[in-house]
Swiss-Prot record:
Disulfide bonds: none annotated. The keyword Disulfide bond does not apply. Keywords: Cytoplasm, Hydrolase, Metal-binding, Nucleotide-binding. It comes from Verminephrobacter eiseniae (strain EF01-2). Its EC number is 3.1.3.5. Belongs to the SurE nucleotidase family. This is 5'-nucleotidase SurE.
Length: 259
């Protein structure tokens, strides 16, 4: 099995090193890393379209790109690797990607880029920042990949996208995997305004809001109770529940305009 690994924290981040070292020990597995040169957190699915991308190789063998997480996976799958991987894995991220985070996350964006190309993909994140219990998280990621492989679920003919969040706990303390839906966060914190040395106003995006929907069955609830959360994701953002209602509204606004 051939695995492509990327992330959004950069090719030198402890999370991607730990993930690579764990996955390469799986029997019959080859692992390649193509990751951003620098931290690209919150870049979502952004692609670089108006400037060239350059690929370099570090002494570790990791290849790094002056672009976004999605750039890395995109160019890897469209020519850089020279073959099609069986699995795309992103992470391990320094901090949670739960609920609304998945919209902004470069970690999820890298995995989603693989999924868009028809390759099964997983985004791995640790719940808390700081890399605490990172070896345990990498071991759990390895275990999940091994189990999916053993059950013949790593099938390029039937791609899927999974979002996995791992509490920062010893491996033996982690509770069983919980399959759950995404929760929701409150609105982000207020923008931070500072003054530059030249007297100009500088603006920093505020931190993510606390959990709003953390009810039982959500990723927030699962990880808060020591479980590893797994949420299947999809690309279709259509609100199917309200589609019929909006169709009726559109007919009233512009009769005959709906197809």
């Amino acid at each position: 099995m051939k695995i492509l690994i990327s992330n959004d924290d950069g090719y030198q981040a402890p999370g991607i090193v730990a993930l690579h070292d764990a996955l390469k020990t799986l029997e019959g597995v080859t692992v390649q890393v193509v990751a951003p040169e620098h931290n690209n957190s919150a870049k979502s699915n952004a692609l670089t379209l108006h400037s060239p991308l350059y690929v370099h190789q570090a002494a570790s063998g990791f290849r790094y790109v002056n672009g976004t997480p999605a750039d890395c996976v995109h160019i890897a799958l469209t020519g850089l690797l020279g073959y099609r991987p069986d699995l795309v894995v992103s992470g391990i991220n320094n901090g949670a990607n739960m609920g609304d985070d998945t919209i902004y996350s470069g970690t999820v964006g890298a995995a989603m880029e693989g999924y868009l190309f028809g390759v099964p993909a997983i985004a791995f994140s640790q719940v808390d920042k700081g890399w605490g219990e990172l070896e345990a998280a990498a071991a759990k990621a390895r275990e999940i990949v091994a189990q999916l492989r053993a059950q013949n679920l790593v099938d390029p003919q039937a791609p899927w996208l999974l979002n996995v969040n791992i509490p920062n706990m010893p491996l033996t303390a982690l509770r069983p995997i919980a399959l759950c839906r995404l929760g929701r966060r409150h609105a982000a914190e207020r923008v931070i305004v500072q003054q530059s040395p030249r007297g100009e106003a500088m603006y920093w995006i505020g931190g993510a809001g606390p959990a709003k929907d953390d009810a039982q069955g959500t990723d927030f609830y699962a990880t808060a109770h020591g479980h590893v959360s797994i949420t299947p994701l999809k690309v279709d953002l259509t609100d199917h529940d309200s589609l019929a209602d909006w169709a009726q509204t559109a007919m009233r606004l512009a009769p005959g305009a709906c197809i």
